[in-house]
């Protein structure tokens, strides 16, 4: 087994985790597969909104992706989206697999977007359709509705 430098934890760093699914396992979630193949700007916009933690909207990111694609072709949009893959990996401590992020996006943009979408949706319990802010509200509602354990009482003692 040949370990690259990305697999070995450095001092004080936690070892990077594997992706939940492989790059070419698009069939694992047919809905995200269809979305990334037929509407990559929408898939990218949703990914970017979550990776940016709501600082950019799905619409703005998706429009930027489409404009870059229309002006530069496949290469420009792949370059733009590969930076978000790098950001996503850093946030969730994921391995750089199967090769460097830009190569993954240049060689197979739809598969890369689909893998990122699956990672966020299924392994981070995020609904990419409702965006970052919608997910934060949903998680806050769930936390508020979860009953907490009653406080522990001191044991009873007898007065003699």
Curated annotation (Swiss-Prot):
InterPro entries: PLAC_motif_containing
UniProt protein name: Protein PLANT CADMIUM RESISTANCE 11
TM region positions: 62-84
Family named by the database record: Belongs to the cornifelin family.
Function of the protein: May be involved in heavy metals transport.
Subcellular location: Membrane
Family annotation (NCBIfam families): A_thal_Cys_rich
Topology relative to the membrane: Single-pass membrane protein
GO biological process: pollen sperm cell differentiation
Organism expressing this protein natively: Arabidopsis thaliana (Mouse-ear cress)
Keywords: Membrane, Transmembrane, Transmembrane helix
GO cellular component terms, A-Z: membrane
């Amino acid at each position: 087994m040949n370990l690259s430098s990305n697999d070995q934890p450095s001092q004080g760093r936690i070892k990077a985790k594997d992706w939940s699914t492989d790059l070419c396992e698009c069939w694992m979630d047919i809905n995200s597969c269809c979305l990334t193949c037929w509407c990559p700007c929408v898939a990218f916009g949703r990914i970017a909104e979550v990776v940016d933690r709501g600082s950019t909207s799905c619409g703005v990111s998706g429009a930027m992706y489409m404009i870059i694609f229309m002006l530069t072709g496949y290469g420009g949009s792949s370059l733009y989206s590969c930076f978000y893959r790098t950001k996503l990996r850093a946030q969730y401590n994921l391995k750089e697999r199967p090769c460097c992020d830009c190569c993954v996006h240049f060689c197979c943009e739809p598969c890369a977007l689909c893998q990122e979408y699956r990672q966020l949706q299924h392994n981070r319990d995020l609904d990419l359709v409702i965006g970052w802010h919608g997910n934060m509200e949903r998680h806050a509602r769930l936390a508020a509705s979860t009953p907490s354990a009653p406080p522990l009482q001191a044991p009873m003692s007898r007065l003699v």
